[in-house]
């Protein structure tokens, strides 16, 4: 009797498994299962599926032309494909989308998109059996009415537009077309390229946790003033080994090649983007510029944290991307530690990053503070030049630093605190500063108003503050009282310029080669050594330029002599 029951249960179980398997197989084609079950199945990605793509052009001379389609059916990507450079013409990409559960038997989903003059079904190997559909701008769509395709990684689920011959898309699951859209001669300078995402939205990026290496070391590279453009950009003040101005060159490829080489040679644990990553006036699509430096870091799996300079959000109102929008984009990118910070204080990008001790410890070993130094003076008549760190930022910093001290005391070695801003503090411009490890080539363009932030940094135990902005300065400095200080506990913090990294920004001043600043931290000794790496030339390519010990045993080190 017992055997019969067991046999019956086994047979029913096998039948149930077979039935479920059959239902799931049929569902891949005919969608039998309810949406609630689909959402639990990793093969499904509920959300918007692209069913069509088209391009519209319009002319301000023709009142009957329009770049708007029926908004109940089409979503317009809000980027003029001419980047507002067309005298009378505009063009926009439109995408038709449906939710997966709303697809009918008559709907087709886009599974591939190409751009080219020839039908991929005729000109490409392996595509002869496919029925490609043409759209304006030399767009070709491959669409499918098979239900299983809407549930697979074949389905196109998002479309975007980037610009420039050097455009890249580092977002997971996205791929960019190699051929630009065919518009007309007016758009050739900044070619518009479609980029698409196949399959579901990838899992939200996991927070990157920077950590001290097993040997107790941690290395930071500070990139300042990259001045990247939409498209390749034009070099400014590019010189050769003899100091002679070189001919025309493309700024961004040269900048990225230089930075990529240093990243590979120095192998940093973290990159600080010190502001003016984007050269607003030559970057009508800031997203394309941002993706170029992000790709450089994401492809190498290097965590990075960014602040803004005065040029990042410049440019014509029609095309410029606000600080808020840029930070929103950056904060979602892989390996990014960038954050907008509290929305009740001035600026965008006031935040801190904790670098943890060696695994498995969860204690902080280093705290890096990032603050928005804003842009131009809000009171040009009284204080000419640039803006300053605001009182509510200083209050936020002070309260944050004090709140972390108890937790930091749990670290078994010496905890170190550093800060990064873009525009130098007024103390950078003080007469009689003790200058070391670099050159003072141009006057400091610090704010005319001193809000007292340097004093607060000192009170809270910050050992160094790095800045950019003045491209051809690359020195470190201590305030004048450091020269005669009897107690080094009252000295500092060090103020260090990074030096300009990008060929899209100015240089000159008697011959200046682009550079980056390296911060090498040895937590076993509470020590920081810093130097620069340069883009040119000869033996200097491998040298540590202006190497300087600035902190030892957790205390600021005063060098024996300046220079």
Predicted regions and their residues:
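His/acidic metal-ligating clusters that form di-metal
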Residues: 266-269, 361, 367-370, 381-480
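Acidic, histidine-bearing metal-coordination/catalytic regions of metal-dependent phosphoesterases
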Residues: 1-244, 536-553, 558, 562-563
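Active-site environment of divalent metal-dependent phosphoester hydrolases
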Residues: 227-232, 279-282, 306-318, 377-379, ...
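Beta-strand-turn-beta hairpins that frame and shape the catalytic cleft
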Residues: 210-221, 352-370, 478-495, 525
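Active-site-proximal beta-strand elements of phosphoester/diester hydrolases
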Residues: 217-230, 365-379, 420, 493-500
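Acidic/histidine-rich helix-loop elements
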Residues: 227-254, 278-285, 381-386, 436-442, ...
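Divalent metal-coordination and catalytic microenvironments
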Residues: 225, 259, 271, 276, ...
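Extended active-site neighborhood of metal-dependent phosphoesterases/phosphodiesterases
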Residues: 180-212, 292-403, 407, 516-518
